[in-house]
Amino acid sequence: MILAKRLLSGAALAMAATAAGAQPAAPAPGFAVAGTGFVKDGEPYQVISGEIHYVRIPRAYWRDRLRKAKAMGLNTITTYAFWNVHEPRPGVYDFSGQNDIAAFIRDAQAEGLDVILRPGPYVCAEWELGGYPSWLLKDRKLVLRSTDPAYTAAVERWIVRLGQEVKPLLLANGGPIVAVQLENEYGAFGDDKAYLRGLEATYRRAGLADGVLFTSNQASDLAKGSLPQLPSVVNFGSGGAANAVAKLEAYRPGGLRMVGEYWAGWFDKWGEDHHETDGHKEAEEMRFMLQRGYSISLYMVHGGTTFGWMNGADSHTGTDYHPDTTSYDYDAQIDEAGNPRYKYALIAKAIAEVTGKPAAPTPAPTVAVTFPVSPIRRSASLWDNLPDPVRARLPLTFEELDQNYGYVLYRVALPAGGGGTLTLKGMHSYAQVYVDRKLAGTLDRRLGQETVTLPARAGVATLDVLVENTGRVNYSHAIRTEQTGLTGAVTLDGKTLEDWRMYRLPMDDPSSLRFTAAPCVGPCFYEAEMTVDQPGDTYLDVRGLHKGQLWLGSHNLGRFWSIGPVHTLYTPAPWLQRGVNRIIAFDVTGDPSDRLTTVDAPVFGKVTTTREAQ
């Protein structure tokens, strides 16, 4: 309110000066909250934003996606900063190439867009461990999202380092960043105001609180996740606008009217249905909120792809587990390949009607193409490509092995004996169990499986447990216990198995594998070739594979899993070259039937129009 009074006083002085014959002063530069809205350069301003994540879009396409978002009527882009991609190991930072967040923000500015930055450190985002680097979990005593000194010290180092990249891009320094979000939906997690105040102090030391700083929460969590001195905004999905804005207005009657996330779509999880939401309803609610004076950020305006190993997993109780797919299409207005879907024009029309600015023509779609893919040329058995092992009395987690993603093969000797029950307590998150390289069973955390019945053994045998990190949970208190691999006791009929060898398989450089022409069955790498005459966007159809990971040259395109609901991997033109392109697929249950083709559109399984409760 003090700011609003100052603005009114400034306007009155300007009017008085004009009446006296003097030239009115130029509007004060800057961006601020005034009452229930924003002012920019002294004039009322309505933020109309959309979320885009730089790490989910090939860098060559950043400007294209930003341009299409602006053409829809947006004036701002919102993005998270993803700690785990920028600090893969403690004190080792990467802001290059695909991870150059400052370049993405400058690209937004070049397209005439403002930016809202959400540094976290927790971001959720259906992203691995909610954006936290997994090495934080190596210390099992460290408590994420708390005032634990070990945690806050790591956060301080990260936020200060991030500030070196983005502080020059704040509006006050000539950049496009008009606002910064403190934490992320903290009210859905806890209500420790000391934690939020400490994080606010960290932001200030990093120079990230020099402009508008705000908190963002779901409607039922506003009181828990807000600070009295900061503006509070509300997050919700389509169909919930009237209820959510009423709760925000009741919580802060004279406060900022803004929707920090309007979920105009939803994400997919392995083994579940593909989500599609009602674009007509979303356009209707956009119109309602804009007419009511709300600033809005669409989540997502363009989802893109969670390339590589970086998908997260949903969990509400800590015992349920729902890993997210590689595709982050989100049924957004701009689809995974950057093409406007029907929602785009509907929402553009709603924005134009309220703002009075004519809608730009809907951009033409990019036509995807297909390319021939060879049969499997060569293969490499996992058993023949193991590194030197790490030895320990009991199994070590991925984090204790200093490994973030991929697989670990755990090996131990079994005594002779009859069949028994093998228990892998706290197995995270998918395992195949072998006795003398013969598959004895599969365990899937999604299904709550932790036991396998082993066969009888006439002599000493070798037990191998191949464990995949299928994505650490990114939501709920489960994040605090998301160590990956064999995280608890491993017993055979109640007796602890000891003296383990562990083979680290991060699979960050498949080019070093030893391929042969010999056929391969079981956990195998397969090599094929795609011949490209002229690079263009395409989709690799993975219905001829089972479960695993796929690389195009040096690019890790992501996971495939025959359970769906997504049966294609988006393959962007900038990552293709003319001529022969090498494809490597790791299939945990490979066999001679494995094959790949390309298609010109994504392939989804069963569709649902229902969004799960968040």
For the regions a protein language model found, what residue spans apply to each?
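N-terminal carbohydrate-binding accessory modules
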Residues: 23-76, 106
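Aromatic-lined substrate-binding rim segments of carbohydrate-active enzymes
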Residues: 62-128, 200, 204
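Aromatic- and acidic-residue-enriched segments that line the glycan-binding/catalytic groove
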Residues: 91-97, 110, 121-146, 196-200, ...
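An active-site-proximal structural segment forming one wall of the substrate-binding cleft
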Residues: 100-117, 141-177
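Active-site neighborhood of glycoside hydrolase catalytic domains
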Residues: 153-227
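Catalytic-core region of carbohydrate-active enzymes that cleave or remodel glycosidic bonds
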Residues: 206, 237-335, 339, 350
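A cross-kingdom feature marking solvent-exposed beta-strand/loop segments within repeated
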Residues: 320-321, 340-343, 400, 409, ...
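Aromatic-lined ligand-binding clefts that engage carbohydrates, nucleic acids, or primary amines
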Residues: 420-434, 463, 530-553, 560-561, ...
